[in-house]
């Protein structure tokens, strides 16, 4: 793009008032618009999307805020099946209704003809033909602005701009998927030279209190679990806001850095919720910006210093790599000259432990520059969180500042492993053997499984499956059933015989780095932000959840090289959606709805099998967190503690409160799904009523609206029996018509011997009576009828000796399970 003859990169924001729930008289006023626009300009945003409100457009003209605008959604007179049939009538409507109101305003720089219309098959062809024809006519009317034909999905085939909507790192994939944008030819139409924009991305729709907004019957609840998992509710808000800012930072800075490789990358406009408060505010100051809003101020600095660092966890005394990038989008169009970078690795008190200065060459306007760094961490550095900080100075003035987080493990990080059971290993490659030797863990090697004792622990090293002797699985299963423990470190499970296991394990195949759209699979084989389902498990001793987000790369990757960094903690996860979880302890999981399993232990006979998807031994000597997890895994496996598929409970379980659930319900596997409840602002309660649909989803007025009504927040409120169900690749729940009659779900717990009663609190949020059946193990079910709009606590006597209970719910999917207590 060019503005006044000079190239310009578009630093945008896509979700803005008006029509977002703010009191109409306020949000349409010139004063409010000016305060809002000035705040965004202060955060270095230079383009926004707004509807056709003249006060807002006048303010954008006055404040120098560019606008991209037009028709969002279907054009007028279109239907869900086809575009408008009268082309010239549609063109006139564009001129008068959709684009015309913006035309007199110099701030308007891009026209949009439609948003996310069909793009494949015959419907897609029809839409492409219509939009191409409309564009051809409209440029006769105004050829001074470029056009987006089908925003998000059209990929530039019907107008001027190659526009994309991708929610990598929210609905699907991860922020690493942005690395695909370095391949310019993959993002162009043959024979065309087009500017590339992302006019929607990032997502991460946080609500009023910072937690993700779990809008019913949408993709939001599943995405929440992918990124903040089963953190306690009181920590969900902080974690969601932090990840939202992380995602915005990486999307915007990578997009700008990648111009070195793909000069057609021209603008990015995250579609995310930047403010806490909307409904009922009296002025702009009451909106309260979120951390993501302030992140714009850093990542959208006209002259950007940006850190590229793929080694997040470092051991004291080691050397790690990073790359410093500079992107010069100076608002005055000036070259960057006579400048230098001062950088430092700072501790929590902002005291540098390492620092240096890097002189900068002349960097022309709209140019980029980078240099690698090798940073040596002093050996006496204590364990903790550290910050890489860089500052560009020009003639003594600060031009740009940016930071990057680094975790350093000090001398006291590692703890010795003291096995109480003999450790045997099968390790053809030798990496695991070396790890054990370096950590003084006693072991013996074997290539035969005939002579194993029931006290032994048998570890199969990473990627060794193809080298196992014949009939190994039969021998390993027999060994486990006698009381042995098998530890299977990560394998290419799609190439592995899994039939010998006592439960069904389904391999995953596609990487989250794959940019195919729509996503071909729901759960990828690799992932970040791993969720420790059993947070008190010995395997996670000394490893907080944030240390399971990303691990250090071991391939010496940087963005000048093809491919992707090896930073996913899990690279070979698997599915347990058809497994009986009374036999399996899910220790860690990941992905949307936590459907992917990273680590589990399967009971069989008197012993067990541990399946692992973590990428561990490749990081020996590189990532102290991966090393600690592997040490903990070996320490647990060679100890006396047994798996706990039946979670021991001696407290009241508040369903939907993850700290109370303590990993009893693991996500996609038990059939008990979170029940989101909308909290409606006081000024909207007369207009928006809570509706319950036939599948039990509760919503305020209508489905969705997480972006148009950000002041309505959906929060966890119990769980509902929802199986059988599946997910679409896009991320929505899918229930077949043949399965709609009733839902099912279960949980497995072990209770104290003194308990003789089970108290279950159930809610019926509907206008009519509903039925639900409660069962325990193989004992007869008990039927309950819940009156309309009632909350009832029902009592079930435990007049049997079993202390390990599989509790099942069967019946109306609209039933809400609120609490369970054993007394």
Give residue spans per PLM region.
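Substrate-binding/catalytic cleft of secreted carbohydrate-active enzymes
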Residues: 31-286
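Aromatic-rich peripheral "rim/lid" segments of glycoside hydrolase catalytic domains that contact
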Residues: 270-327, 339, 659-661
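Beta-strand-rich binding/interaction modules
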Residues: 319-360, 369-373, 384-393, 770-776
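Helical hinge/lid and interdomain linker segments adjacent to catalytic or ligand-binding clefts
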Residues: 418-509, 599-600, 606, 612-621
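Short beta-strands within extracellular/lumenal beta-sheet-rich domains
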Residues: 720-757, 792
């Amino acid at each position: 793009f060019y503005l006044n003859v000079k190239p310009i990169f578009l630093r945008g924001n896509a979700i803005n008032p008006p029509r977002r729930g703010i009191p109409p008289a306020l949000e349409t006023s010139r004063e409010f618009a000016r305060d809002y626009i000035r705040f965004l300009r202060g955060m270095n945003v230079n383009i926004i999307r707004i509807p056709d409100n003249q006060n807002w457009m006048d303010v954008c003209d006055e404040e120098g805020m560019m606008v991209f605008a037009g028709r969002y959604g279907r054009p007028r007179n279109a239907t869900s099946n086809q575009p408008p049939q009268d082309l010239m009538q549609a063109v006139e409507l564009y001129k008068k209704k959709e684009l015309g109101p913006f035309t007199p305003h110099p701030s308007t720089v891009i026209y949009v003809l439609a948003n996310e219309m069909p793009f494949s098959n015959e419907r897609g062809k029809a839409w492409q033909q219509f939009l191409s024809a409309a564009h051809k006519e409209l440029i006769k009317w105004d050829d001074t602005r470029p056009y987006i034909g089908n925003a998000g999905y059209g990929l530039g085939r019907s107008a001027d701009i190659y526009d994309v909507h991708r929610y990598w790192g929210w609905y699907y994939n991860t922020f690493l998927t942005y690395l695909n944008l370095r391949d310019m030819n993959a993002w162009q139409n043959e024979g065309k030279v087009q500017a590339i924009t992302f006019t929607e991305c990032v997502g991460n729709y946080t609500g009023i209190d910072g937690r993700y907004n779990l809008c019913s019957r949408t993709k939001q609840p599943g995405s929440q679990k992918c990124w903040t998992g089963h953190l306690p509710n009181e920590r969900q808000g902080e974690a969601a806001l932090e990840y939202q800012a992380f995602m915005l930072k990486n999307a915007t800075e990578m997009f700008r850095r990648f111009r070195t490789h793909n000069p057609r990358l021209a603008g990015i406009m995250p579609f995310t919720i930047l403010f806490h408060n909307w409904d009922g505010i009296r002025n702009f100051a009451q909106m309260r910006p979120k951390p993501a809003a302030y992140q714009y101020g850093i990542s959208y600095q006209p002259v950007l210093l940006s850190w590229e660092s793929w080694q997040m966890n470092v051991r004291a005394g080691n050397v790690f790599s990073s790359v410093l990038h500079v992107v010069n989008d100076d608002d005055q169009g000036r070259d960057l000259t006579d400048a230098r970078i001062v950088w430092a690795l700072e501790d929590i008190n902002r005291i540098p432990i390492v620092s240096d200065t890097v002189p900068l060459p002349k960097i022309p306007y709209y140019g980029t520059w980078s240099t690698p760094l090798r940073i040596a961490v002093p050996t006496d550095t204590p364990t903790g969180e550290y910050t890489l900080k860089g500052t560009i100075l020009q003639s003594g003035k600060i031009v740009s500042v940016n930071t990057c987080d680094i975790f350093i493990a000090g001398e006291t990080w590692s703890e010795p492993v003291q096995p109480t059971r003999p450790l045997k290993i099968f390790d053809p490659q030798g990496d695991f053997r070396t790890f054990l030797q370096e950590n003084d863990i006693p072991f013996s090697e074997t290539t035969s499984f005939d002579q194993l004792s029931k006290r032994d622990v048998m570890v199969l090293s990473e990627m060794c499956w193809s080298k196992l002797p014949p009939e190994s699985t039969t021998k390993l299963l027999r060994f486990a059933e006698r009381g042995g423990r098998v530890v299977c470190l990560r394998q290419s499970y799609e190439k592995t015989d899994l039939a010998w296991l006592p439960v069904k394990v389904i391999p995953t195949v596609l990487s989250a780095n794959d940019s195919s759209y729509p996503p071909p699979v729901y759960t990828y084989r690799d992932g970040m932000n791993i969720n420790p389902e059993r947070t008190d498990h010995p395997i996670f001793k000394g490893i907080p959840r944030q240390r399971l987000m990303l691990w250090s790369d071991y391939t010496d990757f940087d963005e000048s090289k093809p491919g992707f960094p090896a930073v996913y903690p899990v690279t070979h996860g698997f599915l347990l959606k058809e497994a009986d979880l009374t036999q399996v302890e899910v220790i860690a999981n990941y992905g949307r709805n936590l459907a992917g399993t990273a680590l589990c232990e399967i009971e069989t006979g008197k012993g067990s099998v541990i399946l692992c998807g973590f990428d561990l031994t490749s990081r020996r000597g590189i990532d102290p967190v991966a090393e600690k997890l592997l040490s903990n895994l070996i320490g647990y496996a060679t100890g006396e503690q047994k798996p706990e598929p039946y979670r021991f409970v001696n407290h009241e379980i508040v369903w939907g409160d993850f700290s109370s659930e303590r990993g009893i319900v693991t996500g996609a596997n038990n059939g008990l799904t979170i029940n989101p409840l909308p909290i409606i602002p006081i000024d909207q309660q007369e207009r928006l009523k809570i509706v319950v649909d036939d599948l039990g989803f509760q919503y305020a007025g209508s489905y969705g609206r997480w972006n148009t009504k950000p002041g309505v927040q959906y929060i966890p409120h119990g769980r509902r029996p929802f199986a059988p169900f599946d997910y679409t690749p896009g991320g929505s729940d899918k229930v077949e018509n043949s399965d709609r009659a009733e839902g099912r779900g279960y949980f497995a717990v072990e209770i104290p011997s003194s308990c003789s009663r089970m108290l279950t609190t159930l809610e019926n949020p509907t206008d009519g009576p509903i039925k639900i059946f409660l069962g325990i193990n193989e004992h007869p079910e008990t039927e309950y009828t819940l009156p309309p709009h009632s909350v009832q606590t029902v009592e079930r006597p435990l007049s049997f000796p079993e202390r390990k209970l599989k509790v099942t719910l069967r019946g109306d999917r609209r039933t809400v399970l609120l609490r369970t207590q054993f007394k």
